[in-house]
Amino acid sequence: MEAGDFIKDAIANNKIVLFMKGTAQFPQCGFSGQVIQILKKSGLKDIATINVLEDEQVRQEIKEYSQWPTIPQLYINKKFIGG
């Protein structure tokens, strides 16, 4: 699957998607870790996380998809919330 299709599919099929560096259990940047903590403290569940460090194409494509240059990037109900 192409990176763009993977991103569109992830956003379409999950209520909450976080494109981040690392995983929810082991964030690999401070900002990604902060977003995870905020989401958990807010009581949100079923958060799909995508580790952009595992796929350089996804890492670059998500920036183009959102027209936003930084990661993490949070989508809720298919809407880009921010990064």
Regions found by a protein language model. Name each.
Residues 19-21, 50-55, 77:
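Structured beta-strand/turn binding interfaces of compact recognition modules in eukaryotic regulators
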Residues 3-5, 59:
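Eukaryotic intrinsically disordered and solvent-exposed regulatory patches
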Residues 7-46:
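Local sequence-structure signature of Cys/Sec-based thiol-disulfide redox active-site neighborhoods
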Residues 40, 44-59, 68-69:
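Thiol-based oxidoreductase modules, predominantly thioredoxin-like and allied folds used
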Residues 6-7, 68:
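Short acidic, glycine/proline-enriched helix-loop-strand junctions
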Residues 62-63:
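The conserved cystathionine-beta-synthase
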Residues 70-83:
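A short, hydrophobic beta-strand/beta-hairpin element that forms part of a small beta-sheet core
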